[in-house]
Amino acid sequence: MTTTQTASDVSTLIDGLILEENHDLPLCRLQLTLRVGSTSDQTAQGTAASGGPAQMGLCNFASELQRRGAGSRSRAQIDETLDGLGAGLSIVCWHDQVLYEITSLREHFERAVEILADVVQRPTYPGDESERLRRELLANLDDLRDDDSGLLHRFFSRELYGETPYGRPVAGTEESTQALDLDGAHAWHRHHIVTGNMIAGAAGAISQPEVEHLLRQHFAQIPAGPRRDEPIPSPPQRKGRRVLIVDKPERTQSQILIGQLAPHWKDPSWLPLHVSTVAFGGTFTARLMDEVRVKRGLSYGASARLGNGRGQRSLYAHVFPSAEQTAETVELVLRLYEEWAEKGLRPGELDFIRSYLQKSHAFTVQTADDRLGLRTRLQVCDMPLDHEKTYPARVAGVSASDIEQAMKTWLLPDDLLITIVATADSVLPSLQKLPGLRDAEFEVVPYDSF
């Protein structure tokens, strides 16, 4: 059973309520979701609004720290109580939202919700935990140096989105992490934990009256306040091909993203371009995989993806060949991208992919938790809430002319960003000789310069 509404007696506590009932198992889940994530880092009241590095990572820092001391409990006491209840508590910060979630057996659920209520409303922000968290965040940045795929996406986003919010990493930088403090965390909490900025969601063996009771009983201290999600500006579209080589020593394999800016999720072109992108590189039998892996064995995987969110995201292809085959792989993907943009889908691709997307959609909404996550994201992004139900029919209605128009409008094969994590000395000379990169702008940056 599925319901979505804001009841009149809880509307002063939250901006929206989403419920996905499933009584097959005696498990319950309650979520509170902030309408903002790390894109808000440089706009929170009470903190420096200059756009400087000190603000990056604040949302992640402040929200994670809520988990480490709240109400009358220390971090250890929170963990001990959760263990005794067999409950799970998580806080996750993304660019577009922060998710607070508690899960437990139905018989222990209200006691578990009490802990979530303390975490959301009454964090103590202990100083010792603040310093421990700072050390952990810095250690995570050290670990990132060993994660070629993580480095690839970080540098690609920084280059593509520039100074706009999606160009800033969720967890910040070493410099910004060192500058984070408890005053900033308290200010972030005061500004963002307000009624109009929160969406409630529940899933599992729980009814709407029960959810409303929990909200009234345990979350009445959330102060009144408006939505805090400000529009996310789009970066300017740069002309010409750019090659960013993230220079890392002794790489035997290259990680490569080739992409561009894409339409907003709300744009009418988004769905036709999504259908076309999945046909191009979204399945194991797609053109990109077939040409790169099956026919030539250049990369174990080859995929293309169209992003979505509150702001304008990206379209990119991802491959990871050996170092000596980097130039050959880049040349091939560029040629395939050009062919895709100029000639569109091949015969049979559209019919196959429409059928594939309609059938596979069932797996994305298979469980109550899946549906809750999707519908929460839709509400955060101000998308139509019937999106999940109408998706198969809308995919079926995408025509060849819709796809042709979307591709003509959005695909920019001459203005692609090519980001490569590799050893520069081993790949740069061969890349510079490629005809498709003859006029490209090349830049080499150290892999640890993030």
Tell me the role of every PLM-derived stretch:
Residues V246, A406-T409:
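Short proline/glycine-enriched turn/loop segments at secondary-structure junctions
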Residues A396-M407:
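A short, acidic, amphipathic alpha-helical segment used as a generic capping/interface helix at domain edges
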Residues S104, L137-L144, S234-V246, S355-T364:
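Short, conserved secondary-structure transition motifs
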Residues M1-T81, L85, E101-S104, E114, ...:
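His/Glu-rich zincin catalytic helix
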Residues L180-H186:
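Active-site glycine-rich loop that binds ribose-phosphate moieties when present
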Residues E20, L25-E64, R73-Q121, R134, ...:
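M16 family metallopeptidases and their MPP-like homologs
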